[in-house]
Amino acid sequence: PIRIGNVEVPNRICHVPTDISSSHVDGAVSERDIRHHENLARGGTGLIVVGATSPDGKTGRSTVTNLVIDNDYYIPGFARMAAAMHRYGAKCAVQLQHPGRQAALPREGKLTSNDQAVSLPWSQSHAIVYANADEAKKTVHVLSTDEDIALVDLFSEAAWRVQQAGFDAVELHAAHGYLISQFMS
């Protein structure tokens, strides 16, 4: 066993966060999400980090299949997933991520199964994002102080929901040119 803060992980095997692209179109946890993470726990993984979960389903998804936890509607699905992992003794966390300027921003703030890959002209290292073709020419802007504060609140509320769902920890995704990494220099 190993301790991380006040969480005792049964072993040093950790499943790092990945987007398995199986949530419902609205970002809700699917049965496939639950089975996938349950199987990792059944196989003996000590710590499982559920990846690519957005605190902002309207503007903070990079694909149509990202998980979302921006309101209480999502808590029961996440609770079922946490319980499935805990049943086998695993500890579990949720990776909160917002793609920032790389977000898929389709019309009317809703992703659909008709979304497709488009180029990101402002990023050589991140060539595609899944979004409606109409968004290929979207513009980005510097966030205002009010927008910054609103995003901090969204992350805080999402972390609270993760805790309410029974997860043991939260990971903040600060890599790959996503929102949090855009503040690092």
Regions found by a protein language model. Give the residues of each.
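Polysaccharide-binding and catalytic clefts of secreted carbohydrate-active enzymes
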Residues: 142-143, 171-185
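A generic, residue-level signal for flexible/boundary positions that often mark functional hotspots
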Residues: 3, 134-137, 178
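Aromatic side chains
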Residues: 36-37, 155, 167, 178, ...
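Short, well-ordered beta-to-alpha junction loops that form the rim of enzyme active sites
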Residues: 52-53, 95-98, 167-177
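Non-globular sequence segments
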Residues: 83-86, 97-167
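Short acidic/His/Gly/Ser-rich catalytic and metal-binding motifs that mark active-site loops
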Residues: 57-60, 104-105, 130, 178-183
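N-terminal capping/small domains of soluble enzymes
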Residues: 1-99, 106-108, 140, 151, ...
